[in-house]
Amino acid sequence: MKIAYNGSNCVFLIDDEQNCHCFSYTSEVAAIIDGKYVEYDGPQFYSRTSNKHKSMFRAQFGL
């Protein structure tokens, strides 16, 4: 899986099948990869992200 932050409040995730998913940064969806929060040169996702959003993210990417 690849992750890219475009600097415009949108984070693109490209899964192993090359499907692109877009998440709004402002919704504070946590990027949970290998159990860690992924930080970018710019804004980062915070651990205070709601459990609902975390669950949605995990379900979307099978984490």
Regions found by a protein language model. Give the residues of each.
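Terminal leader/tail segments of proteins
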Residues: 1-63
